[in-house]
A protein has these predicted regions:
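Hydrophobic transmembrane alpha-helices of multi-pass small-molecule transport proteins
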Residues: 65, 136-160, 272-273, 279-281, ...
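Membrane-interface helix termini and inter-helical loops of multi-pass transporters
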Residues: 39-50, 106, 155-170, 223-240, ...
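Glycine-/small-residue-enriched transmembrane alpha-helix faces in small-molecule transporters
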Residues: 1-55, 100, 147-151, 161-194, ...
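Structural signature of hydrophobic alpha-helical transmembrane segments
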Residues: 49-63, 103-120, 171-184, 234-246, ...
């Protein structure tokens, strides 16, 4: 063994420690930032039209991703021409998952929305993949436990809404939108995951092409408030730009870095902490008046973590691990 090889082996432990440290820092930043952004939308952006909010936020993110693709000389046009079917499917599912997510955050607490959204994804992927992979007791037990707590969480929030009759309709809409958003995100994982592996799509190719339909639809629906966003004296346009960074751009970068350094299995156990962190932020900003719903939010987080731990020890990747590998974002 020559001197260079010996030096490389000596440096290996430090490199591993450094990579692990970076990975843990990035996944921690991802969870904190995603939770903060969700609470921010729920608390501060309820008066702006949901379509306008979605369009302006994703437009900033889209421009950022296109700039990165240009600098890296990614051939986006060729990717679109070669994968028309994949592009159409991913755009339709992205429209529902992202637009409904923003609408849900305007109608229900961020912790509840995040728990419903993240909790329904593993079950959707499990059902969709049942024919190809089968459903064993080990694969089904975790999602079944999550479904139980999701049902109890929805029922608890319904009951609380009943005590606040003026908000009942809004809360019901928020819960329904969060569940639909999470379910379509799960469908996105199932429909596009194999195609991305087969065709070797890069992260930037996916990110620069999946939001096009969403931008067209929300741009059309929310165009009447664009002037309000630009002329707002409270700096609404700047707030939306910062929101785009905190809810889309930076989380994607942090998540991908953590997956690269820690592996998808470890990361998939950390991401369900987002609703719990959102819950903690809500207690600081606007404390809950009762304890049942917050406890159920935490139980949903715990059940998803348990589900992912069980599935990550099986021979095949679990649904949320698959989501992290293929989608590049829990959103």
């Amino acid at each position: 063994m020559d001197e260079n090889q010996t030096h490389a082996l000596d440096e290996l432990p430090n490199a591993i420690v450094s990579a692990n440290t970076l990975g843990w820092l990035c996944i921690t930043a991802y969870c904190l930032l995603t939770a903060f952004a969700a609470v921010w939308v729920s608390e501060s952006f309820t008066r702006i039209d949901g379509a306008t909010l979605t369009f302006t936020t994703l437009l900033v993110a889209q421009l950022f991703f296109l700039s990165c693709a240009f600098l890296k000389k990614e051939n986006i046009l060729l990717f679109v021409l070669d994968n028309k079917s994949l592009i159409v499917k991913s755009n339709v599912l992205t429209l529902f998952s992202w637009y409904f997510m923003f609408l849900a955050l305007q109608k229900v607490e961020a912790s509840v929305e995040s728990a419903l959204y993240q909790g329904i994804i593993p079950m959707t992927v499990l059902v969709c993949s049942a024919r190809a992979q089968g459903i064993t007791l080990k694969r089904a037990l975790g999602p079944a436990l999550t479904l139980l707590f999701l049902t109890l969480l929805a029922e608890s929030r319904f009951s609380l809404a009943g005590m606040e009759s003026s908000h009942t309709s809004t809360i019901i809409q928020g819960i329904a939108l969060a569940l639909i958003a999470g379910a379509t995100a799960g469908l996105y994982v199932h429909v596009t995951g194999a195609a991305h592996r087969q065709w070797g799509a890069t992260l930037l190719q996916v990110l620069t092409t999946r939001f096009v339909l969403l931008l067209v639809v929300t741009g059309f629906l929310g165009h009447e408030q664009f002037a309000l966003v630009v002329s707002n004296e409270n700096g609404l346009a700047w707030k939306l730009m910062f929101l785009a960074l905190s809810i889309v751009v930076l989380p994607v970068l942090f998540l991908q870095t953590s997956i690269k350094n820690l592996g998808a299995s470890r990361v998939s156990v950390m991401t369900p902490l987002v609703p719990a962190l959102a819950l903690a932020a809500e207690f600081v900003i606007n404390p809950w008046g009762h304890i049942t719903t917050p406890i159920l939010v935490l139980m949903v987080c715990l059940s998803v973590i348990i589900s992912n731990v069980w599935l990550n020890h099986s021979d095949r990747p679990g649904p949320v691990e698959t989501q992290l590998r293929e989608e590049g974002s829990s959103r």
